[in-house]
Amino acid sequence: MSETIFEPTDHPHRRYNPLIDQWVLVSPHRAKRPWQGQQEKVSEEQKPTHDPNCYLCPRNKRITGEPNPDYHQPYVFKNDFSALLEDTPAPEQSADPLFQMSQARGESRVICFSPDHSKTLPLLTALEIEEVIKVWQEQLRELGQKYQWVQIFENKGAAMGCSNPHPHGQIWANSFLPNEVAREDVSQRNYYEKHGSVLLVDYVQKELEKKERIVVETEHWVAVVPYWAVWPFETLLLPKVHVKRLTELTDAQAKDLAVILKKLATKYDNLFETSFPYSMGFHAAPFNGEDNEHWQLHAHFYPPLLRSATVRKFMVGYEMLGESQRDLTAEQAAERLRALSEVHYKER
């Protein structure tokens, strides 16, 4: 009786994520299963450059009644429904190990990427994205003086819970290290102490050599579908050399970041020729007074779409109770994204 040879594109297997010390189940044989479940609504109506009913457009009133300025560049303001407050008092300490609280202070801000209501990141020019990056850097410098963690992120599309269609991101600063970041901190620190090198710097060099998971590459940056990806078309955006924070980028690296953000976001939109939903955000060294040499700047992109513009992946059942699972292999997803044009389908 002949022994079956393992084939990663056919056989179930687990892949290890060294960044958060967790495993993901890969089930490539399920990729062709029929789908009769929920489908997302797709709206391709042409948005105006200015919507008089939008709370975020220039000159309009926000939901609080406060007017927006007639802004022409990226615009930052305090979130009208902040998840964190600056003056939160500390709770009383509990002696009961099962009922613990800790103080949570912080600030929540919104950044409108541009005054144009119709232009998401891939539809902005690289120069316009550079302006967004400059604002990110300014916010990090300011908030990093008061808080140990500053989270820059974007929820794009209604499928990701975005409550306003005007292209915007958020900036949350807090007095504590969030769970996901704390896991990354421990893993990167342990790797650095064991190997004397930076985990994600070593990882990016190996991905550059292997090439099979690369989606987009520029002079200073590379976007890959990580070996351990959970979401179908998840990507990890990395600088090619050691950089701890966005504020430490050279001018050339910052300009090139704008280029690769536009290219990556364009490929996402081109995949199903729709405004591709995702949650994305940057992780970088905390502002905790340590040297943090073990940290490497990176950005996660978590898009939910799986088979088409209307079929998304759900994190339910086994994934909530056991561990994350995916059907497409990371290599298959990267191949599909890599083959797509870097010219947006609306601009051809």
Residue ranges: model-predicted function:
Residues 244-253, 257-262:
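A contiguous, surface-exposed recognition patch within enzymatic or periplasmic domains that forms
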Residues 256-275, 279:
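Extended C-terminal subregions enriched in glycine
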Residues 1-166, 172-244, 252, 266, ...:
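Active-site microenvironments that recognize anionic phosphate/pyrophosphate groups
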Residues 280-284:
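Acidic/histidine-rich, metal-coordinating catalytic segments
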